[in-house]
Amino acid sequence: MTTETFDGVRLTTKANVYFDGKCVSHSFTLPDGTKKSVGVVLPATLTFGTAAAEIMECVGGSCEYKLDGTDEWKTSGAGDSFQVPANSKFDIRVTEAYHYICHYA
């Protein structure tokens, strides 16, 4: 199931722009203090590092991803999610715009 809306959030209006604009996101905070971000990755192959554990939820498009320490690329499409441990990294390969919500653990 894909998350479509969040109610009552506090949104940071200035975008987080990474990799020369290939990834753009906005951070927001839920009423209970939970932090998340929502964004898009444009066609590219990128490597992201994590401080906190993350759950990447696909809300549109698709990607292939590979977690640190593995050689296996897996696919994530709309309604799918994958987990990334804290203090780790993952590779992401995108051929069409990949729209996501990042849930921080």
UniProtKB/Swiss-Prot annotation:
Reactions catalysed: a purine D-ribonucleoside + phosphate = a purine nucleobase + alpha-D-ribose 1-phosphate; adenosine + phosphate = alpha-D-ribose 1-phosphate + adenine; cytidine + phosphate = cytosine + alpha-D-ribose 1-phosphate; guanosine + phosphate = alpha-D-ribose 1-phosphate + guanine
InterPro entries (UniProt xref): Ppnp, RmlC-like_jellyroll, RmlC_Cupin_sf
Keyword entries, A-Z: Glycosyltransferase, Transferase
EC annotation from Swiss-Prot or TrEMBL: 2.4.2.1, 2.4.2.2
One Pfam family it belongs to: Ppnp
Any single Gene Ontology cellular-component annotation: cytosol
Gene Ontology MF terms in the entry: guanosine phosphorylase activity; purine-nucleoside phosphorylase activity; thymidine phosphorylase activity; uridine phosphorylase activity
Protein family (similarity comment): Belongs to the nucleoside phosphorylase PpnP family.
Described function: Catalyzes the phosphorolysis of diverse nucleosides, yielding D-ribose 1-phosphate and the respective free bases. Can use uridine, adenosine, guanosine, cytidine, thymidine, inosine and xanthosine as substrates. Also catalyzes the reverse reactions.
Name of the protein: Pyrimidine/purine nucleoside phosphorylase
Organism: Ralstonia pickettii (strain 12J)
Native organism taxonomy: Bacteria, Pseudomonadati, Pseudomonadota, Betaproteobacteria, Burkholderiales
Gene: ppnP
